[in-house]
Curated annotation (Swiss-Prot):
The N-terminal domain probably binds unfolded/aggregated proteins; the C-terminal domain interacts with ClpC. Residues 115-141 are annotated as: Disordered. Signal peptide: none annotated. The gene is mecA. One of its GO terms (molecular function) is protein-macromolecule adaptor activity. This is Adapter protein MecA.
């Protein structure tokens, strides 16, 4: 683990995959438990802030960005409006694509901001669509040039398993939701870039690790938690091999 001072108010900590393993922390832990994230970040702060300039500051903030070898954790006190641009500037050499960077960073920031007020207490029956469960011959519930399907995953580990087998390209959008402690994968296929046979084969792969569901995309967008937005398969393939 390496520490670099960016300016008087910001330090960058480079955390490799080996560093995570030594601390018994995985990417899955960081994605699954916001208290685990907070505890891990403060333990890093305690380790690198030997002169206690940051730990004693109530306004300390964390921002995490993935790099090609692990994570970069930025710890700032008295953050300013220009902090984010400074972070992007110093991290650009090691960072993956902007889309990947934003997906992981935004998710971890959302997890840190979670409160108990996010708990869902509504009647489950109001969350369900009126349609029948999807099957491989009825995967098209999209409109126009897209075809959409929602798969209820057996567990989080199902996502990287699916990602390893489905060829990801610009013709598929994938969103991972969590709703009532169950993970759902929404796949949107662009019909101009995928043949009916390709879509059917990809869905067959997905259903090996999940089940059809009557929970609709609309329900997930309104009541669920977005875990990975737009490129869930790509992110899973990159970070959960």
């Amino acid at each position: 683990m390496e520490m670099e001072r960016i300016n008087d108010d910001t330090i960058r900590v480079t955390i490799s995959s080996d560093d995570l393993n030594e601390r018994g922390v995985t990417f899955l832990d960081l994605l699954d438990n916001h208290k685990e994230i907070e505890s891990f970040f403060y333990s890093v702060l305690e380790e690198v802030d030997t002169d206690h300039q940051f730990a004693s500051n109530d306004a300390v903030t964390f921002q995490v960005l993935p790099n090609r070898n692990g994570l970069e954790l930025y710890i700032s006190k008295n953050p300013t409006d220009g902090m984010e641009e400074a972070i992007k500037s110093v991290s650009k050499d090691n960072a993956p694509s902007n889309g990947e960077m934003d997906e992981v960073s935004d998710f971890l920031k959302r997890k840190l901001a979670e409160t108990d007020s996010n708990d869902k207490n509504n009647d489950d029956s109001s969350y369900m669509s009126d349609g029948n469960p999807a099957d491989l011959n009825g995967y098209a519930n999209g409109v126009g040039s897209t075809q959409k399907s929602v798969i209820e995953l057996e567990d989080f580990e199902s996502l990287p398993s699916i990602a390893e087998l489905i060829k990801t390209n610009s013709g598929i959008e994938s969103v991972l939701y969590r709703y009532h402690d169950i993970y759902y994968l929404e796949l949107t296929f662009f019909t101009s870039e995928n043949s009916p046979e390709t879509i059917k084969n990809d869905l067959a792969i997905a259903y090996e690790y999940g089940n059809s569901t009557i929970v609709s995309s609309e329900v997930l967008r309104e009541h669920g938690e977005v875990v990975m937005d737009g490129a869930a398969l790509e992110l899973a393939k990159r970070y959960f091999k």
